[in-house]
Amino acid sequence: MAKRVQHEGGDYRPKKRSKNERNGEGSRISATAEAVRNEPDSKPDATYVQSPALGDLSQIEIDQFLAKHCIKVTDSSEAPPLRPIMSFSHLPSSFSKIYDPLSSFSSPTPIQSATWPLLFAGRDVIGIAETGSGKTLAFGLPCIKKILDSGKVKRKHARPAAVIISPTRELAMQIYDQLSKFGASVDIRVTCIYGGVKKDEQREALKTAAIVVATPGRLKDLKDDGSVDLGKVKYLVLDEADRMLDKGFEQDIKDIIRSTPDSTRQTVMFTATWPPSVRDLAASFMTSAVTVTIGGDPSADPRANTRIKQVVEVVKPQEKEARLVQLLSRSQRGAAVGDKVLVFCLYKKEAVRVERLLRSKNFKVAGIHGDLNQHERFKSLEAFKTGSATVLVATDVAARGLDIPSVKLVINVTFPLTVEDYVHRIGRTGRAGADGHAITLFTEADKAQSGALINVLRAAKQDVPDALLKFGTTVKKKQHGAYGAFFKDVDTSKSATKIVFDE
């Protein structure tokens, strides 16, 4: 059997098997799916009835809400604008049972308020918002309601009604955890598909799942071997689309989309940035999409969450680890002794060294980086989430997608490759309307990034230390589309690994 090559984020791409090597069930599913695919199908008209209470609000109140939350809605069609759902009481009254888990939240987030009416109305939507803005429920609630409206909650074969694609297994698991809570109340089954584990259990779960949350590589593999048919998908979501393109999944995504029905599919894309590559992808498969932007121009320079207090300390390289210990000692005492702190390193070896250092200083610490297997990563994340570890040392593999509640402080021991990655790192704190705090240890070795960092600080109205200004304010653009933020996470001092395939 061929050795497997692990793609970033743990999404494995095994060598394709011949039809004779596949189990008989996969072939049976494929044959049945083809028969169903050829059945006539039509897209039911989506119905969205605006709440009377929402209709009673004045246009001035609506405009003030949009301005307060920096919400911009761009719609090239001639459809009348839909008012944002500003309160949970404004949600459609039908199937109100699915709203029960919302009782733990006070009000919708801006991205939820703006996208819900559009998605309930059946429109294709592009949502552009910072991480931690509530995007999962923004696309998740309309997904569940769409399945309920169709009356086809139960699935007897591997033909899901909705597919949600995410860049990493961790993010896929987080989406699954949230949607399962809402789906359980109305008997809608959700399953999570990702690489690095055996496929047999996933094939079994696919038989009854109405919603499939998946990483692109594993979903494509299961589609190609006949284990799942996407011909009845009514609702397709690409979450963190920019991240998936950075990781090289564009062809997998396009192949998956081509397997879903164009005329009957509602398509949703969420992204933190809006580069040309993401625009081109959206233009290739979305129909008259409405674009909802939260915050400033997403194609402009990256902007940090203004609720995060950013502190930059210019230090000598040899001082960083001692300073880290001081910062943690100060932040992990008194009433804050149990506060969660996320510590970012650039290299895997650096992360291992820092984790050992902090453990030797009696901090409750866990680590997550590319060298850990799936079980070890989940164990570390669970320890951090439950509080048995209050400090998590991570490389950029954890910089996007991880939704860890109540991270009080982010510390950058080493500045990342780009300022975009800096913004994503510190975005782990200050989520869901909370305030956050980020401290960055900046050295002369990072001076090429000083100008871009200064721009981020100024845009968020943060203090810029004189020591940082001395490095200069020139911004040097740096593209790394092929490798994203991860190529420095590889030890380049080693020779390349030779991959050998068995006969």
From Swiss-Prot:
Location, primary (coarse class): nucleus
Sequence motif: DEAD box, positions: 239-242
Pfam families reported for this sequence: DEAD (PF00270), Helicase_C (PF00271)
Annotated ranges, domain Helicase C-terminal: 307-472
Record key words, sorted: ATP-binding, Helicase, Hydrolase, Nucleotide-binding, Nucleus, Ribosome biogenesis, RNA-binding, rRNA processing
Keyword Acyltransferase included in the entry's annotation: no
EC number(s) from the headed UniProt entry: 3.6.4.13
Keyword match Cell membrane: no
GO cellular component: nucleolus; preribosome, large subunit precursor
Catalytic activity annotation: ATP + H2O = ADP + phosphate + H(+)
GO molecular function terms noted in the UniProt entry: ATP binding; ATP hydrolysis activity; mRNA binding; RNA helicase activity
The organism's place on the tree of life at top rank: Eukaryota
Composition bias type Basic and acidic residues, residue spans: 1-13
Residues passing through the membrane, by range: none
Subcellular location: Nucleus, Nucleolus
Ranges for domain Helicase ATP-binding: 116-292
InterPro entries in alphabetical order: DEAD/DEAH_box_helicase_dom (IPR011545), Helicase_ATP-bd (IPR014001), Helicase_C-like (IPR001650), P-loop_NTPase (IPR027417), RNA-helicase_DEAD-box_CS (IPR000629)
Record family assignment: Belongs to the DEAD box helicase family. DDX5/DBP2 subfamily.
PANTHER family reported for this sequence: ATP-DEPENDENT RNA HELICASE DBP3
Function description: ATP-dependent RNA helicase required for 60S ribosomal subunit synthesis. Involved in efficient pre-rRNA processing, predominantly at site A3, which is necessary for the normal formation of 25S and 5.8S rRNAs.
Domain notes: The Q motif is unique to and characteristic of the DEAD box family of RNA helicases and controls ATP binding and hydrolysis.
Name of the protein: ATP-dependent RNA helicase dbp3
Organism field: Aspergillus fumigatus (strain ATCC MYA-4609 / CBS 101355 / FGSC A1100 / Af293) (Neosartorya fumigata)
